[in-house]
Amino acid sequence: DYEEYIDAKKNIFKYQNENDIVVLNYDNEITRACAKEAKGKVIFFSDKEKLDNGYIIDEDIIKICTDKIRKHLLNVNDVILRGKHNYENIATALAATSTLVDIDKAIEVIKNFKPVAHRLEFVRELNGVKWYNDSASSSPTRTLAGINAFKEPIVLIAGGYDKNLDYKPIAKPILEKVSTLILMGQTSGKIFDCVKEEMENVIK
């Protein structure tokens, strides 16, 4: 069950000592509470709270804040990766390696790091339009993460094999962020039913 899953994850820091580091998501109530059980140094990251000590994702800027330093580390617009989840991963990586590598070198690596294939993978830019391949996002939850990764207007190609999932959760984000929706495959009808009352630019 979920409690067993949480306990299993705690094994990551269960056998640490005071010289070790554990990086935790401050915005998640469960991971925040894990700090009480950590034996090593706890470093938090957050994209919601202005932490006095930790790594902050503030709009487009990743910052470090400690008792001794407050510094802008990276503008997320300078990296190839897109999406809130990736920016959280970047903050985590910077925190985890903060005592091991030169942070400027780490930032250079991050700026040039390319995502794995089919996961918000940048394909090309043509006539001012940037094309991304996110075909690995085969569930509504992952499609939602992909949609939320962009501030620009989106032309979304969606659909595919029907896994009998609920597509209602992505209706509102599609209506808010997608200018044109192109549907295909077995799930095209289900997705269309979620947006047909309010969306005009749909191609089936």
Residue ranges and their predicted role:
Residues D1-Y26, I30-K41:
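Phosphate-binding loop of NTP-binding sites
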Residues N17, K39, K151, L175-V178, ...:
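Residue-level detector of structured alpha->beta connecting loops
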Residues D1, R32-D78, V116-R119, V123:
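Extended acidic/charged loop-beta regions that coordinate divalent cations
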Residues L73-T180:
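Nucleotide phosphate-binding/pyrophosphate-handling subdomain across enzymes
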Residues V22-Y26, I157-A158, K177-Q186:
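Short internal beta-strands
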Residues T31-A35, A106, G146, I170, ...:
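Hydrophobic packing residues within well-ordered alpha-helices of enzyme cores
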Residues I170-K204:
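C-terminal helical cap/extension that packs against the catalytic core
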Residues N28-A33, K50-D52, N164-L165, T187-D193:
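Short, charged/polar "capping" segments at the starts of alpha-helices
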